[in-house]
Swiss-Prot record:
Belongs to the IspD/TarI cytidylyltransferase family. IspD subfamily. Keywords: Isoprene biosynthesis, Nucleotidyltransferase, Transferase. Pathway: Isoprenoid biosynthesis; isopentenyl diphosphate biosynthesis via DXP pathway; isopentenyl diphosphate from 1-deoxy-D-xylulose 5-phosphate: step 2/6. The gene is ispD. This is 2-C-methyl-D-erythritol 4-phosphate cytidylyltransferase. Catalyzes the formation of 4-diphosphocytidyl-2-C-methyl-D-erythritol from CTP and 2-C-methyl-D-erythritol 4-phosphate (MEP). It comes from Cereibacter sphaeroides (strain ATCC 17029 / ATH 2.4.9) (Rhodobacter sphaeroides). Its EC number is 2.7.7.60.
């Protein structure tokens, strides 16, 4: 089956510190996005890779490995995350794509096994996404004080890549009014079943300065350093 990967990197978030959005900040000597793109370009069965960017980031994007050679295609994002994803989905229309992976550009440590088992889950469901069960105690707070606890049974921390049968998620995005937190929300609004796949604690989204330090350590371990 033909599979495309959509890497969403059009956001402008700067919670990680510095002047650049987190996906463009350096990690182990390369932009975060360079690590993310490398993971999907090496993934078995992925025939096309689309990178969704903010228009202001085009020059940076063109310098990434794979872009100049045409192995990574650039798509300009929209005013929101779901609009950005839809732009990429529309760019694939008529290309014979059967499955699509949608991934946060700021998750550079996604493993080949996670990509493979997320795609495999599409054999029995139109959508699939990795998640990690919530293990910490959950509190409800008000005015800086704990006012109650929350049962964590059945609660998960969502991750990406989120995988879908292409035509199903394209139709879901076309029908959605916007404002979704992720593509699972878009899919469920269209009545699509989404399978939960075992996620990975190392598949972190680099958002704060401490996340970069942890990601650096994990990359060093993976490299045997």
């Amino acid at each position: 089956m033909t599979t495309a990967a959509i890497i969403v990197a059009a956001g402008r978030g700067t919670r990680a510190g510095g002047d650049l959005p987190k996906q463009w900040q350096p990690l182990a000597g390369r932009p975060v996005l360079a690590h993310t793109l490398a993971a999907f370009r090496a993934a078995a069965g992925v025939s096309r890779t689309l990178l969704v960017i903010h228009p202001d980031d085009r020059a940076r994007a063109e310098a990434l490995p794979g872009v100049a050679e045409g192995k990574v295609e650039l798509v300009e994002g929209g005013a929101s995350r779901d609009a950005s994803v839809r732009n990429a989905l529309e760019a694939l229309a008529g290309a014979g794509i059967e499955r699509v992976l949608i991934h946060d550009g700021a998750r550079p440590l996604v493993a080949p096994g996670l990509i493979a088992r997320t795609l495999a889950a599409l054999e029995t469901a139109p959508g699939a996404a990795p998640a990690v069960p919530v293990s910490d105690a959950l509190w409800r707070g008000e005015g800086g004080r704990v006012v109650g606890t929350q049962d964590r049974t059945g609660l998960f921390r969502a991750q990406t890549p989120q995988a879908f049968r292409y035509e199903a998620i394209l139709a879901a995005h076309r029908a959605h009014p916007g404002g979704a937190a992720d593509d699972v929300e878009v899919a469920r609004a269209a009545g699509l079943e989404v399978a939960i796949v075992e996620g990975c604690e190392d598949n972190l989204k680099v958002t704060y300065p401490g996340d970069f330090a942890r990601a650096e350590r994990l990359l060093a371990l993976a490299a045997g350093l």
